[in-house]
Amino acid sequence: PLKYAVYDGRQLALKISANSVYGFTGAQVGQLPCLEISSTVTGFGRQMIESTKNQVEAHYSRQNGHEHDAQVIYGDTDSVMIKFGTTDLAESMRLGEEAAGIVTKTFIEPIKLEFEKVYYPYLLMNKKRYAGLLWTNTTKHDKMDCKGIETVRRDNCDLVKEVVETSLRAILIRKDPQSAVEYIKGCISELLLNKMDLSKLVVTKALTRTSDQYASGNKQAHVELAARIKKRDPGLAPAVGDRIPYVMIKGAVGAKAWEKAEDPIYVLENNLPIDTAWYLEHQLSEPIKRLFEPILPDNVNSLLEGDHTRRIHKATPTTGGLMKFAKVTKQCLGCRSVLKGTDGALCAACEPKQMEVYCTKLKTVQSCEQLFSRLWTQCQRCQGDLHKDVLCTSRDCPIFYKRKKVQKDLRDAKDVLRRFDADW
């Protein structure tokens, strides 16, 4: 075992060294550019994949007495994926081991093709994008393996990752595509009605350089936002290397993406409306289409349009734009009619229902207090002390934005409740 471990470590070191040298030779700009070497390496790889494909498909065919015609459905770099046609897991593993042995005999030593795993079920979207349940034994799947899709990518908001992962679990594990369809429609409806938690809509990107170091015509959302934050408060200005969180808010017609990016805390404090259409079009639509095109080839657009997309929430901003010139008037808390010349809570018509309206607003305050207490206690447990203030400012934590939002909601709800003081 010791000798094997030494040799295994040695061959791994050689492999990493060879990979590094290959990377150097394939780089257009660098210390060791030599495209002939890198092209030769990839050429041999393609040749071996093609040879493997031809051997497997020729050997495992009905003409040779097999039950199904095998098909190599995917090949990339140093691996191939074979569809043997059988639905029996144990038989697939046996055929995989057997095929690896047959192909290895045709390779020059020490090149060896090894059987690694079985995907069942398996969803291949396109090159370098696939997902499936990974099996290395016949008793239980090891995990749900995803490559190149939004569950493992960092350039999407958490909503996209959650939607894709939940849908994949419904399709692959529960084998219930219809429940995935209903879930997608429900999420889109929640998004358009502005019921989605803000933490799920936050996009983060690394600030690799300052705004003046980018080309003048290449404005990026997170870079421009960093410059705006610096103007508002130089003490909060992000530094190069920081990850900038932002959400997209509604802007003027034809506004660019970099003009609509805004700090999530600033959005919460100023009640700025989220551009839900942008999230649907630029974040959700393509991943959903890629995921469901193999399942609903003729009806995939029904996920993005229909009854569930017809109700849209329109938020009212409290600052900026025309609100600078608007005069805020108080409304009756019962019927929402405009109150003239009074600081009270209700109009004359709603005065008889004063206690009923008050109890409704009081329940709102109590609900916010309960939610805030739960989130506050959860943050205290996380920092390891239930008797100190929460000092955490980690924006990567999903509770952070929930806590900030419920703090604002609680303040607003208490302000509403105080309006009854003028009547009593």
Language-model regions: role of each:
Residues 2-17, 42-75, 82-386, 394-424:
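DNA-dependent DNA polymerase catalytic subunits
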Residues 16-29:
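Active-site-adjacent bridging/hinge elements
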Residues 28, 32, 79-86:
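Short, hydrophobic beta-strand segments
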